Amino acid sequence: MSSLFQPRPVLSSQRYSQSPDYVDTRRSIHNGRLPLRESTGNAQSHSFNGLVSCYQNQVALAPSMQTTIPAPMVPSQSLDCLYRVPTPRQQARFQRRPKTSVNPLYFWPAFRQYRNRQAHKDTQKDKGGVWRRPELEDAFVDSVLLMPHMGRRKFSMGGKLHGRNMLISEYIFVICIALLGSKEIFRIDNSNESIEQMGRKQVSSHMQVVKKFFEDLRCFHFLFPSEEKKEPGSTNSDDCYDEEEQESFKSNPVLTALAEGRVPDVKPNYEYFSQLLALQSSICTRPKTCEIFVSSSDIKIRDDVAYDVHDTPLDQASFPHLNKYTNCDDSPNVLGKDVLLHEYTRSLDRTTSACAKSVTRRWQHDAPAMYETLELPSRDEECLLLEMCATLELHEHAKFPSGSELTGFVEVAITQPALQNHRWKCITRLTRPAELHSDEGKHGVYTNDSGIHRRGCSDSKAECECHTRPRQDIHVPFPAVEWASILSMAVQYPDVEHQRLKEKRRKYADGDGKKELERAGSKRKRSEDEGDAASWTRREPTGSDLICKVAMYQELWSCAPDSTQWTRQAIIFWRFNTTNQWHKYNPVFKPAGTTWRWLTINDPMSRYHQQKALVYPTANVSRDALMSPTPTIHQHLTAAMNETFNSWDQGSSAPHVPHVPPLQTPNNSIGLFDSFSNGLATPPPTATLPPAYPTGNFDSRSGSFDARSASFDTRSGSFDGNLGPNNGVAFLPTTGPPPQHERQPTALGNNNQPFFDGQQSFSEVKPINTAVNSYMTASTSLELPNQLVYDNSGVDTSNMQGWDMSALDGWSAAASAPGSATAEWGPNTKVESHAGDHHGAMWAPPHWPLSAGAAPSSHERGASPRPLKRRRETMDVHVPVTAGW
């Protein structure tokens, strides 16, 4: 059973990065198991390996989270059992990184087999290794996803223009320097080239090897851009992109980092590229055969001579393909017993994928009517797109004997077994230039909707049984009648330049053109033979030029046997060329044949792809950047004094659950952050703790506190209270003894006020006597005159001496108490002592802090000659409140 839990071999990725985003923190778990502190027990951790699959996905778990339930503590265990390191069986599961943390290209079967063969050679250059360090292979594979598609543009860096392959080599150089400190690993002995040149050659050669493993991908052009360049005056100038849609290189973080000589902070979006690779699973059809030829069943061959229906021998020079398959078994199966007269195209090859815009933009210019009928899918998963590019070898005069027939045999394979018993149909649309129309009628879009049947069956049959047996291949209808007319009209526009080139080649083959070949060595002769752009644009259109403007696409639809709903499965885009082509304004010849490739709606040159291809690191934004500035100590102390206004008592039913007050009261009287003049401020840590003072005027139904009925005048130092006896802010003890309790002391003035045992009350904080700064200027009607804190906790007044109020009678003060002070503060409070509450020595005069309860010093009172307060032997609880206080 232990073999079931062995980790799968996964190649390392991103080990070279200096960024913390590339670090797999699950690798930091150490092997081994902590022993028990005491051996008397038998407590073990619950691994639950029998309940959880050994290949579970760990993506959703954060690296710092515990993946197992902590074992319950028993007397024989210490606290370390709560943080036990996982068992070796769990360790294998931790070390197995999920697929989302590994480059998805490593999971492509062809490339994975190659990497398995090369894994043991990576460290040995002389034995076939490429980099001698596996980290450099990871850097190379990541650079394929990181580097943007550049098209014809270059990136200027260090005074040089860099293409995509050069940028990939620069990326590997940066990684190599970060790992080894130098680029000496790329040096080749007995070579005069620089390290940079050797590294670039190594990257270029390795790129050619790796590309072969991904040629069948639908997203190949997302990984490796096409090397076919758009040359002026060339036939291959159809794959063009809009330069305006490309992102600027200045905003690319990868190129910016390489220009600065550092490792980029971004990494490839593995999840996004995994979705692109997953497009392979949605392939439903593959091209299998494409043959276009002219044959006749009336031609008879006698003594290697072909005779038509009128028994007239055919010219061998006019029909060079007559004996093409006479002495071989490679003749087309569709040909049967017919005689081949001319073959336009037959071979079928596959090329790398491209974007659908390379086809549709050409139609938008050359065939706008066809472009209007095109309905592309919104996503690549909805419908398969592919292109068939047929290169036709035109007949010289296209005059065939009577009874000849043009055949276009196109066959595709159904790769999904679920679709092999479906009914299929094909919708064909075709447009051609006006020169290739045989009549002067309306030149619109040709449309044909026909079913796809087996051989011998057609739409004319009332009951078709083609879907009763599974079909692995289907025959796509080809518009042969339309193409017979197109090919017949195309020969009426001769290609003079290619005919002249053919004559020259014929002379060279006969030996008559040797003198002209010697003269071609001079610069003057070469300049005369080279094509001119002006003359090339002024030339008359040829049959090859007109055929290139023919646009056609076919939609393949399928329907399940028990359903009536048709689903579009694939769209085949057709592009036609001839063997007579142009390259840099010069006539060239290409062999006949058909190539096909996958197409995608998503464009690798678009901003969408270039933004989705990268994953940016998590920005380490400071707290001050997201919130208001951290409060100072004075602001914390002021918040502690204002705690009564920002909290409320929940009662004795749930004293341990703090209540978070609303940010703003319904009456807009005062909010949680309105204590500061600068607007919104960070709430203090004590904002949600219950207060040590009795609360006032709190509406438990709405959860708000209305404090507009109370005001404090900071200039006169008086409190104007229009509140009831228990609705205001009580700075003095209320009448009546505090309730008895066993463990927790209760704040005065509220019998249900919760208090935290063993923790100092926030009302006991003694702040520094400094002036309140501008940040704490009063902004509401509630404000305290200074920063003195009144300690109103439960006290033992048995040993407390009263204040000597007679010394205040002769002191003249400008401030006077309001008339409502006596009514509010009377009657006089009688403080009773409870011996069980506190020890009397706690409130002895020597231990009373001056900053909290003593009178201000002389320098704080403006050099007043008034002496300090004197203590009496006994406390007089009937001292009246005078206006001087």
Swiss-Prot record:
InterPro entries listed in its UniProt record: TEA/ATTS_dom, TEA/ATTS_sf, TEC1_TEAD_TF
Similarity-based family: Belongs to the TEC1 family.
Name the record gives this protein: Conidiophore development regulator abaA
GO biological processes: conidium formation; sporulation resulting in formation of a cellular spore
Gene giving rise to this polypeptide: AbaA
Transcription regulation is among the record's keywords: yes
Native source species: Metarhizium robertsii (strain ARSEF 23 / ATCC MYA-3075) (Metarhizium anisopliae (strain ARSEF 23))
Keywords: Activator, Conidiation, Nucleus, Sporulation, Transcription, Transcription regulation
Compositionally biased spans, kind Basic and acidic residues: 508-521, 831-840
Disruption phenotype: Produces phialides on which short deformed hypha are formed.
Region (Disordered): 1-25, 502-539, 817-885
Ranges annotated as biased composition (Polar residues): 1-20
Cellular component GO terms, alphabetical: nucleus; transcription regulator complex
Residues of the DNA-binding region: 124-217
Membrane among keywords: no
A Pfam family hit: TEA
